[in-house]
């Protein structure tokens, strides 16, 4: 057999990033190249595989078994470095002469997959941790008095961050640029270039693996080996010099690559699921297309190719002839440039934000990728052209603070030059339907980017489009920016009193005008915010919001909390103490406040109502000084209603069942359920490695979970703690211990409690806990 050449693209690992800078949670990033590298002895890098076969090359021809035309297999490295772009004419000939192009997974489904995983993890807890670390646990360090009711105007630094901060996941999906090494990179990582080339050349582009299957296999790879006595490390293994991998790839030496993979693999289970099982799936995919009478160009991580269980041997075992294609490193730049110049035609259709505030025409849906620093980001990645469409939103609270859209537009104008990336090519200001800015820039790489910033009475909405070269300057960019619309019903109002009584929900209020913001109609909304404005802005702006603060260990005095909340609200606008009037909306403590702004002499009125962990704030700002008594007096707390009925929920981790409202219960995907079981197995085996006394394993059985109702702000916390037998000598000692726990070490008073034995193995205790000077 001739020399066997395969491209050395290290193990096709999916890296799970724990970076949560802008994701309100653990944003899991797709990355099919994972550097598990540092330093190791040089001689280890030259270790050979267990097979005597030689795998030399990157491009392989697949023929035989009745195929009319050969297919091709190419080993990639999932990075944009120039090293991997030494592509000869044989590469492009094979690519152009194929009916299909396949990658490990279909890039077109990445965004939807990541969104599904994000939603499941946020709802049910992170699957790979066994589902235990659910979000929104208790109060997430909320500053109830200092920040929760501080409806302030954005600081200039927030605007600066909004403009300078690149869309989360855009680089991960489209470029994989290293930042400092961008002068030594091409426009995208090699796999996506092949994906784009297939699209632009009219090929059918597919994934050899499903996203669910690939992700599950990669997660299974973290399960420790049964016979591994070393301390658990999911990404263990020894380390190697990263240059060893690059050198092996440059030499097209797949045997060396396979050996390097063996060195860095944490164990047999890691290698099985990260490589072996996935290799079988990839080979099956190639085989299925060949049986259809079609030929295909398949590109997978080079580490998947060599060895007895590599894709090459998998195909040979199925009866195919697989041989290396002579492949030089004389880069065919002409072919590459021709493909890069092609614009893949995309159909732009109208897309809406989750709350229908804005719409724009784009190639696909916008997915929320970040919600941090008060800035919400949504992204639509055009994988075929390497372009992205993004929308940023930042609440200004302008109707409450008195900062008009025109004023905020001027504030923004003063920082555009400093904070918008690149050299400004064109800059326009507009005033209709709202004030804003239209800016076109060119980055140091020569990429055109365009920004459209719109300032509505309540928020700043910024639209961005970016891409390689002058892509944004084409018709797609014009169509996107010309199609942007702000929904009039979401930014203006009519003078018609409106009764709002959400179902499910437990409030009722009569707003003097129709609301242009009403999150109570959105079942996915995590906050309650209702707002409307008189036709003449001077006549009044009205809003209702709810802050949830669940503190099960302490109950503050009602009067103290009401006073400090009202004073904190007022101190943003005046140095004088507000006028405070305590009230009682039986059994809920209330307080109204009023003051006049020192700056613009506007009048502020508010009412705070406390219902257990729920704090309601009704507010009004006007220039007439007329108190909105009718609005405040219309507010009621009503019994919760659940029109969709109830259903039973089972939690296998907590080992309990409970009845929950139907519309509150989102079903976890099958992938999530599988990942959760894998996570539990990982945790169990990891715990078993900590000492012989089993202490870690014992405490690791603790459970913490919660059930949340976004519509009402209610939360139920579930905690379980296993006790060894005879920890409590009798029932009285058990009750004394739980009394202490329920009363927060006797800091609060137990108003009533029950003690009930159910059968021989269960005792049920209930507690109602109170504290002095509080109705809660």
Locate each region found by the language model.
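Bacterial Sec-dependent N-terminal signal peptides
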Residues: 1, 7-52, 58-60, 484
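Solvent-exposed, polar/charged alpha-helical surfaces in well-ordered, non-transmembrane soluble domains
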Residues: 89, 93, 192, 196, ...
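Solvent-exposed loop/turn segments at secondary-structure junctions
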Residues: 78-80, 107-110, 213, 302-305, ...
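A cross-kingdom marker for long, charged
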Residues: 269-345
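A conditional alpha-helix N-cap/helix-loop micro-motif detector
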Residues: 52, 84, 187, 275-279, ...
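Structured, acidic catalytic/metal-binding patches in enzyme active sites
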Residues: 58-266
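N-terminal targeting sequences that direct proteins away from the cytosol to non-cytosolic compartments
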Residues: 68, 315-388, 395-435, 441-541, ...
């Amino acid at each position: 057999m001739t020399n066997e050449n395969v491209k050395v693209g290290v193990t096709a690992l999916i890296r799970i990033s724990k970076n949560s800078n802008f994701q309100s949670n653990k944003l899991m990033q797709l990355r099919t190249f994972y550097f598990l590298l540092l330093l190791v002895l040089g001689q280890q890098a030259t270790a050979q595989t267990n097979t005597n076969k030689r795998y030399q090359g990157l491009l392989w021809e697949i023929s035989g078994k009745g195929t009319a035309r050969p297919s091709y297999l190419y080993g990639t490295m999932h990075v944009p470095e120039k090293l991997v772009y030494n592509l000869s004419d044989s590469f492009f000939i094979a690519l152009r002469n194929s009916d299909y192009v396949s990658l490990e997974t279909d890039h077109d489904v990445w965004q939807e997959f990541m969104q599904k995983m994000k939603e499941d993890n946020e709802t049910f807890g992170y699957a790979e941790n066994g589902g235990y670390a659910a979000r929104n646990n208790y109060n997430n360090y909320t500053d109830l008095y200092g920040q929760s009711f501080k409806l302030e105007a954005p600081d200039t630094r927030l605007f600066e961050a909004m403009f300078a901060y690149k869309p989360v996941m855009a680089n991960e999906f489209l470029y994989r640029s290293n930042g400092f090494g961008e002068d030594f990179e091409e426009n995208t990582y090699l796999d996506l270039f092949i994906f784009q080339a297939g699209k632009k050349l009219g090929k059918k582009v597919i994934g050899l693996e499903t996203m669910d299957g690939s992700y599950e296999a990669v997660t299974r790879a973290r399960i420790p080996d049964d016979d591994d006595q070393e301390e658990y490390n999911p990404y263990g293994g020894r380390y190697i010099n990263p240059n060893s991998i690059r050198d092996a790839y440059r030499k097209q030496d797949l045997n060396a690559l396979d050996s390097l993979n063996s060195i860095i693999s944490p164990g047999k289970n890691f290698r099985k699921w990260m490589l072996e099982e996935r290799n079988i799936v990839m080979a099956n995919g190639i085989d299925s297309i060949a049986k259809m009478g079609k030929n295909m160009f398949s590109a997978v991580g080079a580490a998947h190719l060599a060895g007895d269980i590599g894709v090459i041997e998998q195909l040979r075992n199925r009866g195919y002839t697989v041989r290396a294609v002579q492949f030089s490193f004389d880069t065919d730049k002409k072919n590459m440039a021709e493909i890069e110049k092609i614009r893949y035609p995309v159909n732009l259709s109208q897309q809406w934000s989750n709350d229908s505030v804005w719409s724009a025409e784009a190639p696909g849906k916008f997915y929320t990728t970040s919600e941090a620093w008060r800035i919400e980001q949504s992204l639509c990645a055009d994988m075929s052209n390497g372009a992205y469409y993004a929308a940023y939103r930042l609440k200004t609270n302008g109707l409450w603070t008195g900062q008009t859209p025109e004023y905020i537009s001027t504030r923004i104008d003063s920082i555009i030059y400093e904070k918008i990336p690149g050299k400004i090519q064109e800059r326009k200001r507009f005033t209709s339907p709202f004030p804003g800015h239209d800016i076109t820039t060119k980055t140091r790489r020569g990429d055109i980017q365009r920004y459209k910033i719109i300032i509505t009475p309540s928020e700043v909405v910024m639209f961005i489009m970016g891409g390689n070269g002058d892509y944004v300057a084409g018709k797609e960019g014009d169509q996107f920016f010309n199609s942007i619309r702000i929904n009039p019903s979401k930014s203006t109002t009519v003078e018609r009193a409106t009764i709002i009584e959400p179902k499910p929900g437990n409030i009722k209020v009569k707003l003097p005008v129709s609301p242009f913001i009403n999150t109570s109609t959105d079942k996915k909304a995590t906050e309650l915010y209702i707002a409307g404005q008189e036709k003449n802005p001077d006549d009044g702006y009205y809003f209702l919001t709810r802050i949830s603060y669940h503190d099960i260990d302490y109950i503050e005095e009602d009067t103290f909390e009401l006073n400090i909340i009202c004073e904190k609200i007022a101190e943003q606008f005046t140095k004088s103490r507000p006028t405070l009037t305590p009230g009682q909306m039986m059994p809920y403590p209330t307080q109204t406040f009023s003051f006049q702004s020192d700056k613009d002499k506007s009048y502020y009125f508010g009412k705070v109502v406390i219902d257990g962990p729920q704090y309601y704030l009704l507010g009004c700002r006007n220039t007439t000084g007329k108190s909105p008594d009718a609005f405040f007096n219309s507010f009621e707390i009503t019994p919760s209603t659940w029109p969709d009925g109830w259903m039973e929920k089972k939690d296998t981790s907590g080992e309990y069942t409970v009845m929950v409202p139907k519309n509150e219960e989102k079903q976890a995907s099958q992938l999530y359920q599988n990942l959760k079981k894998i996570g539990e197995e990982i945790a169990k085996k990891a715990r078993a490695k900590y000492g012989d006394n089993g202490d870690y394993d014992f405490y690791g059985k603790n459970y913490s979970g919660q059930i949340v109702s976004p519509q009402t702000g209610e939360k139920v916390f579930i905690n379980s703690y296993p006790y060894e037998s005879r920890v409590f000598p009798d029932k009285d000692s058990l009750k004394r211990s739980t009394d202490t726990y329920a009363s927060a070490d006797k800091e609060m008073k137990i108003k009533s409690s029950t003690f009930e034995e159910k059968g021989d193995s269960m005792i049920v205790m209930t507690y109602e806990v109170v504290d002095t000077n509080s109705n809660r």
